[in-house]
A protein has these predicted regions:
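Helix-breaking motifs and short loop linkers at transmembrane-helix boundaries and internal kinks
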Residues: 39, 71, 92-97, 158, ...
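Conserved MFS/SLC helix-loop-helix module at the cytosolic interface between two early adjacent transmembrane helices
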Residues: 57-96
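Cytoplasmic helix-loop-helix junction between adjacent transmembrane helices
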Residues: 102-139
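Helix-loop-helix hairpin linking two adjacent transmembrane segments in secondary transporters
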Residues: 133-180
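A late C-terminal transmembrane helix in Major Facilitator Superfamily
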Residues: 316, 324-370, 374-375, 385
Length: 417
């Protein structure tokens, strides 16, 4: 079977990237259904959310850089097989135990896929602009469409508890078959020894020395954006139903969709801007958006909350893209799987840990006070990210000026003759 042209393969990988994230968000609108059906507590619901993140982080920490050694396609194939198996568990789930198993398996598969998919996207990108667009837009599009489509199906479709998983299962099966014609973008170099293999699979975050400064400077931006995404996906449904009185699953999903849809649209329009411009727009927009959203919650004004979600979603995309642009530019091709896996370790820790804490705290201090505390935390991370962005820009400007001065100071070569 002839391999696809790299440009076509790029779009197939982009679709897979979005589909993995779509599947990761799809169970969210079903959690209230499971809770009502099986009668488990809010703490158990938090555990269901946490087990997915924990297994995904374990996968990122162990097999995140595996594709740099064995090639991209084998890792993606195994991840898709595991994702299909997790969808089967969701379909047959009749109790919390099976639901936990399904979410845990999905976490393992998603962790194996994310760093590899990002690396493959960059490997195959027709241009840096298009690659940056997909890397920035895929999380927003995947998460937004997963929540929205699942919410509509839960509210209006037959067999609402299983239909979304059956659809995802079929799409993953099709993508697994299509993977056969995707060209390999990373030469299989294997491992020098068993010790090398064991060291690669040992749980750790690995960032090459030459990337470390840029990576660490980008972490606050990653934390700010993904923490806010975790807030929307973990407590967003509760805010919409308890604060604004929206009980329709489809409408609730559409309201949550606004945040991620605006992030996706912003990614399309801002992708060719320099990372400094993205940060200069994204960080203030992110801060303004969360403040407006909080004002909507406190005033119980749904229109104000939606406006805040629009502004915050736009800032989310620009901020995340700025961080990813900086990291991508600093990362050698042979280490993309390793570095991007580390990116998602930081991102998903930020996505999950505050959300889990909020899920525990909300029963003690109430939803509004929890949201106030969460927004304060996000704003603090935005301030830290802005400080790092300004510092890095000043260093870059100083380096360019010093280089120009050194060049000007060089004596002109004497003319011969």
């Amino acid at each position: 079977m002839a391999p696809l042209h790299p440009h076509r393969a790029f779009w197939l990988i982009a679709a897979t990237y979005m589909m993995v994230l779509f599947a990761s968000a799809a169970p969210s609108p079903l959690y209230p259904v499971y809770q009502e059906l099986w009668g488990f507590s809010a703490l158990t619901l938090t555990l269901v959310f946490a087990v997915y993140v924990l297994t995904m982080l374990l996968s990122l920490l162990t097999v995140g850089s595996l594709s740099d050694h064995v090639g991209r396609r084998p890792v993606l194939a195994v991840a898709l097989v595991l994702l299909i198996a997790s969808m089967v568990l969701f379909v047959v789930a009749q109790d919390v135990g099976t639901l936990l198993a399904a979410r845990a398996l999905q976490g393992l598969a998603t962790g194996a896929a994310m760093g590899t998919l990002t690396a493959t996207t960059v490997d195959l990108q027709p241009s840096a602009r298009i690659g940056s667009t997909i890397v920035g837009a895929a999380p927003a599009i995947g998460l937004a469409s997963g929540v929205a489509v699942a919410g509509v199906l839960v509210e209006y479709a037959p067999a609402p508890r299983v239909l979304i998983y059956e659809i995802i299962l079929g799409l993953f099966a099709a993508l697994l078959i299509a993977l056969l014609v995707v060209p390999e973008t990373r030469e299989r170099i294997g491992f020098d020894s068993r010790r090398h293999l064991a060291g690669t699979l040992a749980p750790q975050v690995r960032v090459p020395r030459e990337v470390r400064t840029v990576f660490l400077a980008s972490v606050p931006a990653l934390v700010a954006t993904w923490s806010l995404g975790g807030l929307y996906l973990s407590l967003g449904s509760s805010v919409v139903s308890r604060v604004f009185g929206v009980d329709n699953h489809g409408a609730a999903g559409a309201i949550l969709f606004v945040f991620f849809a605006c992030a996706a649209l912003t990614s399309l329009f801002i992708t060719d801007r320099p990372s400094t411009v993205k940060a200069a727009y994204g960080l203030p927009a992110l801060a303004a958006g969360v403040v407006i959203s909080l004002a909507g919650v406190l005033a119980e004004s749904l229109p104000l909350y939606i406006v805040g979600s629009i502004v915050a979603g736009s800032g989310w995309a620009a901020t995340f893209l700025s961080a990813m642009d900086n990291i991508t530019a600093a990362t050698p091709p042979a280490q993309r799987g390793q570095v991007f896996s580390s990116v998602f370790v930081a991102s998903y820790l930020a996505f999950s840990v505050p959300a889990v804490i909020a899920g525990i705290v909300v029963s003690h201090i109430g939803l509004r006070d929890t949201i106030i505390g969460y927004v304060g935390y996000v704003l603090a991370m935005v301030m830290i990210a802005a400080t790092f962005a300004v510092t890095m820009r000043r260093r870059a400007t100083t380096a360019v000026r010093d280089s120009a001065e050194d060049a000007a100071a060089q004596p002109e070569p004497a003319c011969k003759g």
